[in-house]
UniProtKB/Swiss-Prot annotation:
Pathway: Pigment biosynthesis. The keyword Nucleotide-binding applies. The active site is at C2 (nucleophile). Belongs to the asparagine synthetase family. Keywords: ATP-binding, Glutamine amidotransferase, Hydrolase, Nucleotide-binding. It comes from the Eukaryota. Residues 2-220 form the Glutamine amidotransferase type-2 domain. SUPFAM superfamilies: Adenine nucleotide alpha hydrolases-like, N-terminal nucleophile aminohydrolases (Ntn hydrolases). This is Amidase chry2. Its EC number is 3.-.-.-.
Amino acid sequence: MCGISAFITHPGHSRSPVLNGDAKQVVEELETSLDLIAHRGPDARGRWFSDNHHVGLGHVRLSIIDLSPSGNQPFHDEQGGIHAVVNGELYDYERYKAQLADEFKFVGNSDCEIVIALYKHYGLSFISHLRGEFAFVLWDENRQQLIAARDRYGIKSLYYTVHQNKLLVATEIKSFLAFGLEPEWCVRSLRDQSWRVDSTTFFEGVYKVRPGHYLICRPNEREEQHPYWDLEYPDKFAKDLRSEDEITEGVRERLLEAVRIRLKADVPVAVYLSGGIDSSSVAGMVSHLIKQGTKLGNETSLLPSSMKCYTVQFDEGSGADESAIARRTADFLGVDIHLVKMDEEALVSRFEDTTWYSEVPLPDLNGMGRLALAEAVHAQGIKAVITGEGSDEHFGGYDAFRADSLSEPDHSWPAMMTDTERQEAHALASKEAQYGIFGDFTPKVPISTKRMFYSNHVASSIARVGSLPFSDWTKVYGNSIPETTMIEGFDGRVRDNILKRWHPVHTAQYMFVKTFMPHFILRYNGDNIDMVHQVESRCPFLDHHLTEYVNNVPPSLKMRYNAKDKSWREKHILREAVKPFVTDEVYNMSKKAYMGPRKFWPGGPLHKKISELVTKANVENLGFVDWQATQDAMDGAFNKQEGLALRRIITVAQFVVLGQRFGVKRASGRR
């Protein structure tokens, strides 16, 4: 787990050698860009420049596999024509090293060395052979091409922009400040929320390398993104002939393997544990694997008691504390548990840093708890953790999936209820979720978009997250509807599958995986936050060998509705698969969203912090937020205890923090 920053003089501009003064400048710029992400890699730092200084690769290292200098980056091939910087963990690397040993000379034992070897062996198709959490930049001097790629689910972030004739690529946007970038708000992207769907960000001209994509830049061509992988789901009319026991065993085997390969490290490894089934099942499987003889990182003991779990302990009356359940799970497994206490003051003290390092606004406070977890783990000398992200999106853990799971029969599996019962349950689920906020479509909305929205409910659920009170002038960008932006952000193949092939719950899962998960959850509760304290997070539920199998599980085995007592059983097939590894309490417990505290009183620490940030001057300096509506949200959040108002005011405060720390110019209708 590391941080990368790179540049290439942009195609179409002069490729003549850089003069000495300019060469010194680009060296200093790259060095400063690494300073801005130095928290990601305290163990080593490396740089490489082409002879003409038109290309530069920089890397800061957190050493996890191969702690020796031979694992330092950038990596180079033996001929000196191919160079790469890699962030993340690549599994199955030993198999590839053995396979390619005759044609590539490996310098050390680092997993990331296989990137250049696979590229030389397979060409551009090599990315599909990578398994794990990764982002990288590779420069091929012979072909004069730069390749930047990101893992399938966006666990690792990777951004790019063009500034002063250079294509810049980095793990975090803040690195671009070193090259002189002066960020501006992309109000169009903010207003229609396209930054949640496509490659744009809320900064003008700054883009994401999308999950499952690679960026390529060649001489005399503009940089382009291409997909190398995407989610697939079965035809909703195809019968699944497997038994439930067979599918359960298939999930169990693949999840165990995904956990097992993530235990390998030359440093200590721990587990993040909450009260839910996702992290509990991971902890249970780690304990099981230790008993079976699998080493946990560099731990020599094969006793479960050597395993450490870390849990956030919110205030007991906050409605967010799961530490009691986590403690009972730890006792059941016979493992060590460390509780990290988080009261309101502790949350507030981390509010600004969580926003700055995540580089996204998310109207919840669980990211501050995640930052405290990483801090506690780091303090005890642990460099890697196993986490539970990605389970809800694939196994059907969100309430927002309920209506979609019932909007059509599941033709792939024997009926669990009559059609009348299904329709009644669907109507109730739709009402409970308060769908239908989409309103009337304007004549400009294509018929196909209307059809996709009315056959799927989850788009509006995602679009409601973190909505802002926009200033009137922003209407110059049109009265765009975020739900249409989301639907129309998918390519023609996906839209055709949504309309014709996929069950609605699979469409809902696709939308979450492509939008909310990479752009919110994995930034605010994942790598960006963990790496503030030099902790690598590994996500077995996002192992593509597992998810490709789970995506082919019938909807009825993911979300199960009991028409007799009108009850839901979320993640049914996961519960059955992990039953041997969790307590009866966790196995039987209903899904509860993992969120931070949601009620705060006037005059308390959060109210004071928000009041300090959300002033008239600060809001007006954003330029795109209405002050009167913001005042109304402040009143609703703290005086009236309105949940939607709290989320809105938190989002405004986060944008204030981002604007101040990035030095963003005030937005206006004049450009």
